[in-house]
């Protein structure tokens, strides 16, 4: 029951394109992004500090850095256009800013897929108090 409540809380914060990111992760990895990466390590989920705990957490660190470089639109709210065939994602948009958001999400989804074997349950709902190290630059 507690897990269902936690998942409901995580879903409340999912707006705009973040649901697109969830769907993209699902298409590329076959996993729910919210369930597997909504609160993982030091960087997956809301916020981020310290050092990435493993390659899966590093995917989120790099994704955060990618979002930090986006100018002119809001990576968490603006919608983008993409298509998928099998597990391949193609970002297609006339707007360069929203295309950039899509490319950030695509890179993260592929990173999750390529690093699924590094995922460790001990980092699921990892306490942020364990993320005390000085963060590395993007």
From Swiss-Prot:
Q: Which domain of life is it from?
A: Eukaryota
As its record notes, the protein acts as a catalyst of: a 1,2-diacyl-sn-glycero-3-phosphocholine + H2O = a 1-acyl-sn-glycero-3-phosphocholine + a fatty acid + H(+)
Give the Pfam families listed for this entry.
Phospholip_A2_1
Provide the tissue specificity. Expressed by the venom gland.
Protein location:
Secreted
Gene3D superfamilies associated with the record: Phospholipase A2 domain
Disulfide links within the chain? 42-131, 44-60, 59-111, 65-138, 66-104, 73-97, 91-102
Q: Which residues bind Ca(2+)?
A: 43, 45, 47, 64
The molecular function terms in GO held by this entry are: calcium ion binding; calcium-dependent phospholipase A2 activity; phospholipid binding
The EC number(s) attached to this protein equal 3.1.1.4
Family as reported in the entry's similarity comment? Belongs to the phospholipase A2 family. Group II subfamily. D49 sub-subfamily.
Quaternary structure (record): Homodimer.
Q: What is this protein called?
A: Acidic phospholipase A2 6
Q: Which organism is it from?
A: Craspedocephalus gramineus (Bamboo pit viper)
